[in-house]
A protein has these predicted regions:
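Conserved active-site segments centered on acidic
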Residues: 1-68, 135-140
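Helix N-cap/beta->alpha junction signal
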Residues: 4, 75-76
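Phosphate-binding/catalytic loops
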Residues: 70, 76-140
Length: 140
């Protein structure tokens, strides 16, 4: 699991910097196995950028999803997965991250087993999205 914990770390920091304390941010992966170590390259990229993403992997589950006000997914198949594990009445909470944050059709692709530059590109995409999310929340 690489992108979700990085997005969580970025968003937590941006919200804190904006003085927004009423939002709880968590992450989970649709393909993750609970309790594994995080991706080493993503840990390195995150640390270089000053983000804290320590912890273990966590698989997305229906109870956590139902308890969430907003579920942001990296790729369309994640949206489908999430819609498959929660009741239809909660589907309105599920969105593609880049579409919800920036109105963009971009997808945040999985950098696993790719060069470090690809990880850096994912970091930049997530920073843009998390900045936009922070601004949206701050305006509410």
């Amino acid at each position: 699991m690489t992108r979700s914990p990085l997005a969580e770390g970025i968003l937590r920091r941006k919200l804190a910097e904006a003085g927004i304390t009423c939002v709880e941010v968590t992450s989970a992966g649709t393909g993750a196995t609970d309790g594994l170590d995080r991706d080493r390259m993503m840990l390195e990229v995150a640390a270089e950028a000053g983000y804290e993403i320590s912890g273990k992997t966590r698989r997305a589950d229906s109870m956590s999803a139902i308890g969430s006000d907003l579920i942001l997914c990296m790729e369309p198949h994640h949206v489908s997965y999430m819609k498959g594990i929660i009741p239809h009445s909660y589907h309105h909470r599920i969105h593609l991250l880049m579409k919800w944050a920036l109105g963009s059709s971009e997808v945040v692709y999985d950098p696993t087993c790719r060069p470090k530059d690809f990880y850096m590109s994912v970091l930049a995409d997530l920073e843009r999205a998390c900045e936009a999310i922070t601004q949206k929340i701050d305006r509410q």
